[in-house]
Amino acid sequence: MSKQSQHVLIALPHPLLHLVSLGLVSFIFTLFSLELSQFGTQLAPLWFPTSIMMVAFYRHAGRMWPGIALSCSLGNIAASILLFSTSSLNMTWTTINIVEAVVGAVLLRKLLPWYNPLQNLADWLRLALGSAIVPPLLGGVLVVLLTPGDDPLRAFLIWVLSESIGALALVPLGLLFKPHYLLRHRNPRLLFESLLTLAITLTLSWLSMLYLPWPFTFIIVLLMWSAVRLPRMEAFLIFLTTVMMVSLMMAADPSLLATPRTYLMSHMPWLPFLLILLPANIMTMVMYAFRAERKHISESETHFRNAMEYSAIGMALVGTEGQWLQTNKALCQFLGYSQEELRGLTFQQLTWPEDLNKDLQQVEKLISGEINTYSMEKRYYNRNGDVVWALLAVSLVRHTDGTPLYFIAQIEDINELKRTEQVNQQLMERITLANEAGGIGIWEWELKPNIFSWDKRMFELYEIPPHIKPNWQVWYECVLPEDRQHAEKVIRDSLQSRSPFKLEFRITVKDGIRHIRALANRVLNKEGEVERLLGINMDMTEVKQLNEALFQEKERLHITLDSIGEAVVCIDMAMKITFMNPVAEKMSGWTQEEALGVPLLTVLHITFGDNGPLMENIYSADTSRSAIEQDVVLHCRSGGSYDVHYSITPLSTLDGSNIGSVLVIQDVTESRKMLRQLSYSASHDALTHLANRASFEKQLRILLQTVNSTHQRHALVFIDLDRFKAVNDSAGHAAGDALLRELASLMLSMLRSSDVLARLGGDEFGLLLPDCNVESARFIATRIISAVNDYHFIWEGRVHRVGASAGITLIDDNNHQAAEVMSQADIACYASKNGGRGRVTVYEPQQAAAHSERAAMSLDEQWRMIKENQLMMLAHGVASPRIPEARNLWLISLKLWSCEGEIIDEQTFRRSFSDPALSHALDRRVFHEFFQQAAKAVASKGISISLPLSVAGLSSATLVNDLLEQLENSPLPPRLLHLIIPAEAILDHAESVQKLRLAGCRIVLSQVGRDLQIFNSLKANMADYLLLDGELCANVQGNLMDEMLITIIQGHAQRLGMKTIAGPVVLPLVMDTLSGIGVDLIYGEVIADAQPLDLLVNSSYFAIN
């Protein structure tokens, strides 16, 4: 029996109440059965109590069986006393009933699968054997032996038949019933069909018993119709109800079966032929559907065989014992055997002995369910006895009951790859020996997979044990903190400029500080991007010590030489120039001879901005800002200008006296140019080069702020393309992108210079028309819509047509709230699309009312969803992008069901709340269900769970206290409970957050994205994780702005000692990009599919956390 089948299906919180309910059910069915016994036999002709006990034993753990037997027996005895006298009680019969129930339950557990006991006809035959044949026969024998009577054969037959009929009528229903089956009848169609079928079956069965000959033949036809029409559960319920009604009619009037219906037979003598044909026709159609399904399965198997046979890599079906069941041509060519020869061998016989044990360990994990698939590099013997390398990928096919059937193996030839690796290794050994003789360490950095490779000398230089895997963090921690920023900048600049670099820095070693000189060159890929860096490290400590001695003798020379790549100007105490290097001469336009003795600000024409005021005091620059952010411009005397950043260093004598200063000026023109490009990317759509939503909303806010002062009227237009998705689906995304660019140019050509056109997302556009009335706005919008409707887009020789709809709202003194005008334009646009597309609609108040009626969810329905409807907790696995298999943290999202059965996600549901109490109530239910149903299992698995906590819940001291009380009373360690809190709420509710952290909970700040102002107030002890906004991560692999923002957030997180979480991540390329940035954790489909929390904790295996 599988582990799953060993779990107890039912575990009620009140067992005593459940036993009482069983006793009451047994009492009712016993009363019914005993009523039937009053028309002719001492034994009941139809007996249900034994079947009730049998089902109860089957569905409950063995420790509850005594209680079940006692409660059901008391129900039987009570029914007997109610109908008969106390003296008529026969405890022997009750004991026999218990023996039959125990035997039947044991047999059913052995013969049937646990989760779905009745899957096919074979299962039903095993059910009949275990409940309707063996137990009744055993009971009949015991009755004859223990209570002998005048006619033992009659007693035996009545007992066996009554028990068998009761078992076949009740046991299937009892085995199939599950509480969630009742939820299916929320579907009105299924409920109506079930009730109608029940009513028709009972009515026609009643009429058959009263007026038709051979009534049971008619009833058989009716029950077959019910079986074909309805699902199993409903069909077995109708069978039980029909049996009870017919038996009750027979008990009330035994003469029903003896009365011939001569009148009907005289008028319809051929009626039996109809009864012969109906079941045959029904079964013919059922078998036809079954054969069609078998044909479909056969076709699928044929497709699989063809795909396997003609695959370019080796594929095989392998038995659970290792025998080759089926192989394709590629595998046969790789191993040198024919298919017939491989069938006589096992993979163990062909595997290199050193790889066999590792392979078998993975096979055991696969069979036990610990893993779903595995891959490894392994060696095989081919027919000639040679060892060949292969990349093996294996998955397991299981039977519906979970039994392993066979393995699917993919075996790819990597022999040439291994030979190349061996050649490269030998070459590397020769290079290493040569460099060891010269004391030079060689390193390589592959950028995309982020892999570092060091030779032996590198480990010796950094005094790092050879078993430690080198990476950026290992190297970065070795660098002296004072040199880290400069080193990182040099490397980043080299990568951006795709040029070699030379870098000198210091590292910390056991004996103190070691000076390192690094030289590196880049290797470009086919696209011209840097693929990897190759470089050397040299120990320059002795040279540096000598240089330090020379620099101490002449500090001015030290500073000048150290800054030789930048403009260097020396001044005396009177601010007059005493030295200028060539770079300074070039940037200022003055030669050193001309500048000597001239005041500094006469030579250096520095302004704040390109056309800003002159700098009057060289010490007035904002040193708190970075080099790029300081908007300082140096104007050359001969023309031209430079964006610069400068620093001033005082010059001192040996006794500390100040003798002047050294001014170092850096040319940051390119850096500021990049910053401007990033600023442009942040405010413009990358595809159409129109303003994006953020820029559009900013322009709208500026326009709204001037309405009261200028008393002008403006127009806001929303434009939505029609049939764009059809072009995108039929011609491809490239065509869709080209169409958007062409339409953007078309619309832009029809606007004034002061108008603002923006792409809001997808196929939606926004248009701001300053100083424009409704009539003019309607005219402009109509022109645009007509132009779009008439536009012919040609792609790959085909003409595509799209349309557009527009909604207009007027902005004036009485209507200048951003959210309202955006909503009005959206509602007007919706009215245009709803009115037939290709239209222009001006907003009217009644449109908003109609839109609200369609979209709003009533408050009562929201409360009912929170309090009564089903709630599902979905778990999303979180792991490091560098080790995606290691998951020990799970983010929880919520799915709710509306009263119509529609699934609504948590964020959409919360956005519809008009009362903060709804968020508070939803939080309370989430925590209650988690601690009641999942906390114990989560604690036993040792995994960390992150639950959402809204701002309303966080602001409630009562809810926070209740949460901590539930946590204290549960077996869950507080460190395993993570709470997801919106980032903007952390400062306003710092006291509640600190209270949760002191209790041991971990805090996850969500919605961390484009607003970086929060980091000005965020402290290191406020939270543990930063959950990045999902939109920020979606296209990070192709969006430089998003990549820069995530890099900034990652830097802040490292500074604060927090970890970053990004997602959802769907593409491996996005995972690689986030890994390269240094993001700590990610979630999404590349890590694991989301699954219900109860399934996660009940069916998964975890390491000890």
UniProtKB/Swiss-Prot annotation:
UniProt xrefs under Pfam families: EAL, GGDEF, MASE1, PAS_3, PAS_4, PAS_9
Domain PAC stretches: 374-426, 501-552, 626-680
Cofactor: Mg(2+)
PAS domain segment(s): 300-370, 553-623
Disruption phenotype: Decreased biofilm formation, decreased expression of DgcC, a probable diguanylate cyclase and of the curli regulator CsgD. Disruption leads to decreaseded expression of adhesive curli fimbriae genes. Also partially suppresses the reduced motility of a pdeH disruption; concomitant disruption of dosC, dgcE, dgcQ and dgcN completely restores motility, suggesting these 4 genes, together with the c-di-GMP phosphodiesterase PdeH, form a network that regulates cell motility by altering levels of c-di-GMP.
Keywords on record: Cell inner membrane, Cell membrane, GTP-binding, Magnesium, Membrane, Metal-binding, Nucleotide-binding, Repeat, Transferase, Transmembrane, Transmembrane helix
Domain EAL: 855-1104
GO terms assigned for molecular function: diguanylate cyclase activity; GTP binding; metal ion binding
Site annotation Transition state stabilizer: residues: 725
Catalytic activity: 2 GTP = 3',3'-c-di-GMP + 2 diphosphate
Annotated compartments: Cell inner membrane
Enzyme active site: 763 (proton acceptor)
Enzymatic class: transferase
Induction summary: Expressed during transition into stationary phase, expression is equal at 28 and 37 degrees Celsius. Expression is RpoS dependent.
Gene3D superfamilies: 2.10.70.100, 3.30.70.270, EAL domain, PAS domain
SMART domains named among the record's database cross-references: EAL, GGDEF, PAC, PAS
Pathway: Purine metabolism; 3',5'-cyclic di-GMP biosynthesis
SUPFAM superfamilies: EAL domain-like, Nucleotide cyclase, PYP-like sensor domain (PAS domain)
Cofactor note: Binds 1 Mg(2+) ion per monomer.
Transmembrane regions: 9-29, 38-58, 64-84, 88-108, 127-147, 156-176, 190-207, 211-228, 236-256, 270-290
Role this protein plays: Catalyzes the synthesis of cyclic-di-GMP (c-di-GMP) via the condensation of 2 GTP molecules. Involved in the control of the switch from cell motility to adhesion via regulation of cellular levels of c-di-GMP. Part of a signaling cascade that regulates curli biosynthesis. The cascade is composed of two c-di-GMP control modules, in which c-di-GMP controlled by the DgcE/PdeH pair (module I) regulates the activity of the DgcM/PdeR pair (module II), which in turn regulates activity of the transcription factor MlrA and expression of the master biofilm regulator csgD.
Protein name: Probable diguanylate cyclase DgcE
Species: Escherichia coli (strain K12)
This protein's encoding gene: dgcE
